[in-house]
A protein has these predicted regions:
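Amide-donor transfer/coupling interface in amidating biosynthetic enzymes
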Residues: 23, 38-153
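Cysteine-nucleophile active-site neighborhood
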Residues: 1-41
């Protein structure tokens, strides 16, 4: 009954604990990418208000398939972006928690991440784009967290 929310690696670990095999994605997702809420996700207390789609900050090169018995909530062009396990456990691939400072720090360290370099994103473009988008995305993240807290018994 305790609500769980796994983000990126945390989502991968939650999915793995539920029986999914975490694997390298076909390509890394770095930066801002569209995420489509599934029909099941439209009814979800966390992701439903984001339907039909939203743009999310991503920084991952691994993915997880839908664990047995899980409900698919969101997808990107590359991979599953979220699922619910049971009534109160969510595994998300995107980063609703990322702050402006964190995102800009990751972008500053871009060259140190071989997956970031090979994904073809230009950090000189990603930094300003993040500056433009992060405030709205932070509102989305805070609202998502409030909805998650409201699921607690």
């Amino acid at each position: 009954g305790v609500p769980l929310l796994g983000l990126c690696l945390g989502g991968q670990l939650l999915a793995a604990a539920a029986g999914a095999t975490v694997r390298r994605a076909a390509r890394p997702e770095i930066g801002w990418h569209p995420v489509e809420v599934t029909p099941e996700g439209g009814d979800d207390p966390l992701l439903g208000p984001l339907a039909p789609s939203f743009e999310a900050f991503q920084w991952h090169s691994f993915e997880f398939p839908l664990p047995p018995g899980a409900v698919p909530l969101a997808r990107s062009e590359v991979c599953l972006q979220g699922c619910r396990l049971g009534e109160r456990a969510w595994a998300l691939q995107f980063h609703p928690e990322v702050s402006r400072a964190d995102a800009l720090h990751w972008i500053d360290d871009f060259e140190a991440d071989p997956d970031a370099v090979r994904c073809g994103v230009d950090p000189a473009v990603l930094g300003p784009k993040t500056g433009e988008k992060i405030a709205g995305f932070n509102r989305l993240g805070r609202d998502l967290c409030r909805r998650w807290l409201a699921t607690a018994p």
